[in-house]
């Protein structure tokens, strides 16, 4: 990277896209030669240092989680049956959620990242609304949890599903959108879903221009 910066003339450069890796991007943004040039950090949800002329094109995971914590704190009744389904890679998130909801029940997935139906059934109740917070970026666990939570719903049993971070894994076409919809799946996002073939004003302007 030093070689690229030191051997190129950036005087006619309008903008720099990347590097893709946040640590490399942060290093580039410290260089005097490109300090005034707009630099865009693409794709990654990991935060970059917001120095002069730095722009992050994707909302950071940390920011989305912070907003979801605030929403959950204001919205969930502490007397509801709050269940945390958290895999081994999200223990820090589990800790923060338990600080918000100390009475919450933690449901541990099996080693192969699935939930035991009998255990799910025993932890959900009929007498209170069941609020399930799912923290995982593993497709197997997400699929297992959404399927089983959906199956638990009945006239007597209410189940709603939340996550503090909806990763791209949720775009997998093998996940049932109907099940997630039935669970009133709630999460933060940095983009507004559009219907197929529908464009917003910025996209229409871009298409007409280019």
Where are these regions (language model features)?
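A generic structural motif
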Residues: 42-44, 87, 104-119, 136-137, ...
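Structural motif
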Residues: 1-7, 65-68, 112-123
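Extracellular/periplasmic periplasmic-binding protein-like sensory domains
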Residues: 144-210
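Extracytoplasmic ligand/sensor domains, especially the bilobed periplasmic-binding protein
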Residues: 17-86, 91-93, 97, 171
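A short acidic, amphipathic alpha-helical/loop segment
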Residues: 3-4, 27-31, 71, 95-100, ...
